[in-house]
Amino acid sequence: MNAFDSQAEDSPTSLGRSLRRRPLARKKLSEMVEEELEQMIRRHEFGEGEQLPSERELMAFFNVGRPSVREALAALKRKGLVQINNGERARVSRPSADTIISELSGMAKDFLTHPGGIAHFEQLRLFFESSLVRYAAEHATDEQIALLAKALEINSQSLDDNALFIRSDVEFHRVLAEIPGNPIFMAIHVALLDWLIAARPSVPDRELHEHNNVSYQQHIVIVDAIRQRDPDKADRALQTHLNSVSATWHALGKKSQKMR
């Protein structure tokens, strides 16, 4: 008998006479191995940092082939439950915020291609960063405000180089997201910007110069409001900024489509 021997099924009548019989989808062996190992990890049968049994031992325990074991371990790695290094047995790990968000990445990128998808994510970013600037205005330390000012300075030095400006723009907002000290906020923020930037249309560099300067000036207003410890002013400045960014990229996208 192995780990997957089935138990006797209930009588069909127990499900109700009105229900039609329909076949249940069969799970792959690798999925069954994955589920069992995941439960063992969550029950702390294997502690964080501890190595799992070898592939050969897992094959014997579950009575499955090597491909099923390897597929199961790969799935657990994607969930952040194990780390796999070449030549070593899988080692139990704890999922990070980045791991959790990365699991959503494929679905998010697909959703962005749907009608209204970008607008929905822009609204999500607006709601999210609105809370961040309010928090920053009320709680940011002098050191954190100094980091924002430094990011702003780098922003100003990148106005004539679009690639550098985008990086400095992302860095400015990253510093803002870092202020609460919550790693989940950071993971969400990084993912949101990655998804939205990837969905932006390709436009000539000359089209972006004016946009870069406008964004920089709006960043100044945001930082000034945070320095003044005025959450309402910071929130208004942030909303003005993100609405302006959204309108600019929508206009550039339409212009790009007409030129094709």
From Swiss-Prot:
InterPro entries: GntR_C, TF_FadR/GntR_C, Tscrpt_reg_HTH_GntR, Tscrpt_reg_NanR, WH-like_DNA-bd_sf, WH_DNA-bd_sf. CDD domains: WHTH_GntR. SMART domains: FCD, HTH_GNTR. HAMAP family: HTH_NanR. PROSITE patterns: HTH_GNTR. Residues 27-95 form the HTH gntR-type domain. GO terms for molecular function: DNA binding; DNA-binding transcription factor activity. This is HTH-type transcriptional repressor NanR.
